[in-house]
């Protein structure tokens, strides 16, 4: 409810206060979830730019991550309770709008090992002096960079790990249904952070294209192996079934939620 913040603040009900209290609640929740849980948020609407007005509307966008779908669902329930509590404390109304969701990625060591073997069969890309100089300049702008050796030029041995890279992708949903493997290549200078301007600056560079083509060849090699070696495919399927332990894929997106641009409100 909008009102004049100086003359009649008692008549207003601040949605911005509710969002602020909600965000504070998120901070306290961090102490009581698993260390692998990630809770991100961005205030996308503060209700306006006039401080002398009780803000009648406000909006916050929340992104939750965890190692598995069940944990995300549990944290989501608690986050929604915090939102309801914030609305109750401020006398405001609440609307929860579900935007998107993806599933956790199920690792597959059978395919991972085969993918690395295919990488090792390939010749490493040859980078020109200009390529190295460009990557070195970009790397020098990053405190974690290595301007003297900006391009990774080795292929490490396969190392089975259970921790999946904590970025969100709908590849995770695919991995619940069929054995799945992903490969990464040095398309960024050593030490580059994702979503940084340095990552954007090299996205269309020659070294990035060369590394991408190499990974494409390795992935094609995995596909050929699966066609020519039925036993490899069966081993990958067996591993997937073992990891799922009888669990069936359930889409984490509720029924009725349709794709849309984030800028479009429900």
Task: Walk through the language-model features, giving the residues of each.
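Midchain, well-structured core segments that form catalytic/ion-binding scaffolds
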Residues: 1-142
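His/Asp/Glu-rich mid-to-C-terminal helical/loop segments that flank catalytic regions of hydrolases
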Residues: 17-20, 24-32, 68-81, 188-242
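Short, highly charged C-terminal tails/helix-capping segments
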Residues: 40-44, 97-107, 233-253
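Short, intrinsically disordered/low-complexity patches at protein termini
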Residues: 85, 96-97, 207, 219, ...
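Hydrophobic alpha-helix feature that most strongly marks membrane-spanning transmembrane helices
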Residues: 88, 120-124, 176-179, 186, ...
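Helix N-terminus capping/helix-initiation residues
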Residues: 108, 128-129, 205, 229, ...
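Hydrophobic, well-ordered secondary-structure elements that form the walls
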Residues: 115, 174, 219
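Zn-dependent metallopeptidase/amidohydrolase metal-coordination segment
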Residues: 132-216, 234-265
């Amino acid at each position: 409810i909008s009102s004049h913040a100086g003359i009649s603040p008692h008549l207003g009900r601040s949605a911005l206060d509710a969002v602020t209290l909600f965000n504070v609640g998120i901070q306290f929740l961090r102490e009581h979830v698993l260390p692998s849980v990630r809770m991100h948020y961005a205030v996308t609407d503060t209700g306006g730019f006039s401080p002398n007005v009780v803000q009648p509307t406000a909006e916050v966008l929340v992104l939750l991550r965890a190692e598995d779908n069940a944990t995300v669902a549990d944290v989501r329930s608690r986050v929604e309770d915090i939102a309801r509590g914030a609305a109750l404390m401020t006398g405001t109304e609440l609307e929860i709008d579900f935007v998107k969701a993806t599933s956790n990625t199920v690792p597959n060591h059978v395919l991972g090992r085969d993918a690395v073997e295919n990488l090792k069969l390939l010749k490493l890309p040859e980078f020109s002096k200009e390529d190295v100089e460009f990557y070195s300049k970009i790397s020098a702008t990053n405190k974690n960079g290595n301007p003297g050796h900006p391009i990774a030029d080795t292929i490490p041995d396969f190392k089975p790990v259970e921790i999946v890279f904590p970025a969100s992708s709908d590849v995770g949903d695919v991995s619940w249904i069929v054995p799945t493997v992903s490969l990464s290549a040095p398309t960024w200078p050593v030490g580059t952070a994702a979503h940084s301007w340095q990552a954007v600056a090299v996205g269309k560079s020659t070294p990035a294209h060369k590394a991408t083509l190499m990974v494409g060849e390795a992935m094609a090699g995995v596909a050929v192996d699966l066609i020519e070696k039925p036993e490899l495919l069966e081993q990958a399927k067996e591993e997937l079934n073992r990891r799922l332990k009888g669990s069936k894929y359930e889409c984490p997106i509720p029924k009725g939620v349709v794709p849309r641009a984030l800028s479009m409100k429900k």
